[in-house]
Amino acid sequence: MSKIDKPLDSWREELTEEQFHICRLGGTERAFSGEYHATKTPGVYHCTCCGTALFDSDAKYDSGSGWPSYFQPVDGEAVRELDDFSHGMHRIEVRCGRCDAHLGHVFPDGPRPTGLRYCINSASLKLVPREG
């Protein structure tokens, strides 16, 4: 997968204010406020910045957290995980594997088969519904 590296000013021109704040500055939307937290439409969730496929609706579940939650990404290259020591705690940040957009965090309290909960901001996603 070819990487995308753009200056912040380019991203600022292409994204909404909320998308820029979350994806490029590492922000977080309020729980239960995002477009996709309760969506059950079958399809694939892509990065809002670069269009890379990130999560399939087959891996989406209701974690009760108020953010879209998935037990796995579409493949091992779709996302990358980084240590995050902000806010006085240790978490694992999830970023787009192609453009490095901040997506959310992953926690070890998810369902089978992975036991993981990818807790993702709706503003970092674009749902492409499955046809048929």
From Swiss-Prot:
Zn(2+) binds at C47, C50, C96, C99. PROSITE patterns: MSRB. It comes from the Bacteria. Gene3D superfamilies: Peptide methionine sulfoxide reductase. Keywords: Metal-binding, Oxidoreductase, Zinc. It catalyses: L-methionyl-[protein] + [thioredoxin]-disulfide + H2O = L-methionyl-(R)-S-oxide-[protein] + [thioredoxin]-dithiol. Its cofactor is Zn(2+). Binds 1 zinc ion per subunit. The zinc ion is important for the structural integrity of the protein. Its EC number is 1.8.4.12. GO terms for biological process: protein repair; response to oxidative stress. One of its GO terms (cellular component) is cytoplasm. The keyword Metal-binding applies. Belongs to the MsrB Met sulfoxide reductase family. This is Peptide methionine sulfoxide reductase MsrB. The gene is msrB.
